[in-house]
Each structure stands twice: as C-alpha cells, then as structure tokens.
Amino acid sequence: YLRHMAIDFRSDTVTRPVPAMLQAMMQAKLGDDVFGEDPTVNFLEEKIADMFGMEAAVFCPSGTMTNQIAIKCHTQPGDEVICDELSHIYQYEGGGIAFNSGCSVKLLKGDLGRIAAAQIKYAVNNRNDAHRAYSKLVSLENTSNRGGGSCYHFKSFAAIRKACDDHELKLH
C-alpha cells in the first residue's frame, strides 16, 4: 500500500485530517492561549523550551509567522538579511522582510537553496560604508520548495555558524 501512496509536500495547507485526527481535535481540552489557559499549547511550549534549553518558547501557527518574528527580533530597520535566492523568506512570504522589519535582502546563489560558508564573507557589507545596509542576519532553510527538498549537512551548518560569528552576524 505505501509503495503506491503519494505524499504531497507542496505545502502544509494541502493536508487533510483523517477521522482519528478529527476525533482527537473534538476531544482536546481547549483554552485561550493568549491568557495562558490552553493546556495543549502550554505543554508544547514547555516541551520545546526544555528540548532547546531555553527559558520559554512561543507557538506560532505557521512557518511564515515564525520566520517573520525571528527576523524582526534579530534586526532593526535598515539592516540587511542574507539568504539564498530560492529561500522561502524571499520567494513566498509576501515581502514580509521589508514590510515587517524594514530590512533589505541580499540574495546569494547557492546549490538548490543552500549557501556555503565561504560566500558569507564576500556578502557582508563594509560596516564603515554609510551607503550600504548593515548586514545583520543570515537566514538558512532546508527547503522543500524551489530547492526540491535539499538539506544542509550538519558540518555546513557549523561552518556557516562560524562564518556568522566571524562577521558578527546573527543566524536564523
């Protein structure tokens, strides 16, 4: 059966719950998460915070919202975000970087959505040049969109992390 089953990864919005999922939703304990009264959201946020050794976590209902909040937290208006030219934050988030954070974007040509650590030092703007945006954040993703499901190797992440540290860049 599974050999012939197609799995649609185009978007998280194309999925449909099976009857057991619908039943679980009907029986779930509910509350207002804004007031800290939703036990399911509270449990999820506590579990994720513990997993990552953080004081707290915030549940976001979409990847786009999560990305835009992270970018806003890491940047100031006028800063620059460095990312691959195929990245979701550039291609599919409605200009959110400019609209929500007031930042410009520097696009790098990577390999199926993956940039290399060596590209970062050449992408960073001169911090003493008042005519250029302040390079502040590098954004990475394991893309299932235009990169066709390509994933970074952990060693690549580590090398990019070091390049970001070397150039005082935040990493998302």
Language-model segments: what does each one mean?
Residues V18-G63, E85-L86, Y90-Q91, G96-A98:
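Conserved N-terminal alpha-helix of the aminotransferase class I/II PLP-enzyme fold
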Residues M51, A70-G78, G96:
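Glycine-rich loop at the start of a catalytic domain that most often binds anionic cofactors/ligands
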Residues G102-A159, D166:
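PLP-dependent aminotransferase-class I/II
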Residues V81, S104-V105, C164, L171-H172:
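Hydrophobic beta-strand scaffold residues
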Residues Y1-H4:
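Short, Lys/Arg-enriched N-terminal segments with co-localized hydrophobic residues
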Residues C73-Q91:
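Conserved PLP-anchoring active-site segment centered on the Schiff-base-forming lysine
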Residues E55-T75, L108-K109:
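Conserved core of the PLP fold type I
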